[in-house]
Amino acid sequence: MNSMLNPNAVPCQPSPQVVAIPMQYPSGFSPGFRRQRNPGFRPMFNRRRNNNGNQNRGRQNRQRVQNNNRGNIRNRQNNGQRGNRRQYNQPSPNVPFEQQLLMMANETAYAATYPPEMQNVAPTKLVKIAKRAAMQIVSGHATVEISNGTEDSNKRVATFTIKVVMN
């Protein structure tokens, strides 16, 4: 009895308690079962996180569109169809969102009218400027007019006007 009361006398005394702990679980809820089930859930969470990233980006862009012009057709269309939002945001699921923006920016840059002072600017810079415009306007068509900014600073700033045609 004294050896059981004294923890220094028998150092191996707690080991039967450690062995007996898994018997407290019900048969269906053993920790091994939990360990087997977790890897099946991980891809679902990864997929959901990727979708949420795209949806958040689209939601931020749509908020900018809503602030720019209040009676937007796409916003009215999507109010009652929250479950099918992904189908409207991404017309082709194979093309990522940045690629769609780049394609839109290329079309916008080709449709833009440039003043003669800006003809010597590199086309990639014009596409970058048009990409900023395309990110602000996801729905509708935009033509970008680029003109030189103020001459006060030694750095020339290109300003652009976005014209939106709602249809």
Curated annotation (Swiss-Prot):
Keywords, sorted A to Z: Host nucleus, Ribonucleoprotein, RNA-binding, Viral nucleoprotein, Virion
Chief localization = virion
Is this entry keyworded Ribonucleoprotein? yes
- GO terms, molecular function: RNA binding
Here the segments flagged for biased composition (Low complexity) are 51-90
**InterPro entries attached to this UniProt entry:** Torovirus_nucleocapsid (IPR020253)
Motif extent (Nuclear export signal): 153-162
**RNA-binding: is it a keyword of this entry?**
yes
Function (record text) = Major structural component of virions that associates with genomic RNA.
Q: Which family does it belong to?
A: Belongs to the torovirinae nucleoprotein family.
UniProt name for this protein: Nucleoprotein
What's the source species' lineage? Viruses, Riboviria, Orthornavirae, Pisuviricota, Pisoniviricetes
